[in-house]
Amino acid sequence: MSITVFIRYQLDPFQCDAFEDYARRWLTIIPKCGGNLLGSWMPHEGTNNIGSGLSAFDSLAADEAYRARLKADREGAANFRFAQEQRFILSEERTFLRPVT
């Protein structure tokens, strides 16, 4: 069964540019590590501290294998460090979704 991972980020609204840099880096890193990146979104109008990302996988096992590759990837690890050092992500929630058919 295919799954989509929905990630909801609570952001520091004064560091949205840093989140945009972070999200842009995933555009190449996620596919390289085996994820199907559907996109990342950031605040435009209205609520100014919520960003999101969607990635699809063939199964939960495929997501777990991808996450292991992502943590071992040099660029992936660097992007995680960037987020930790800059502290623009205040919290992160993951929801695993399945399509309605």
Sequence positions of predicted segments:
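Short, structured motif recognition centered on aromatic/hydrophobic residues
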Residues: 3-8, 19, 30, 51-57
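Solvent-exposed residues in well-ordered beta-strands and their adjoining turns
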Residues: 10-12, 56-58, 97
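Short, surface-exposed ligand-recognition loops at beta-strand->loop->(often short) alpha-helix junctions
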Residues: 11-21
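An amphipathic, aromatic/His-enriched active-site/gating alpha helix that lines ligand/cofactor pockets
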Residues: 21-38, 56-93
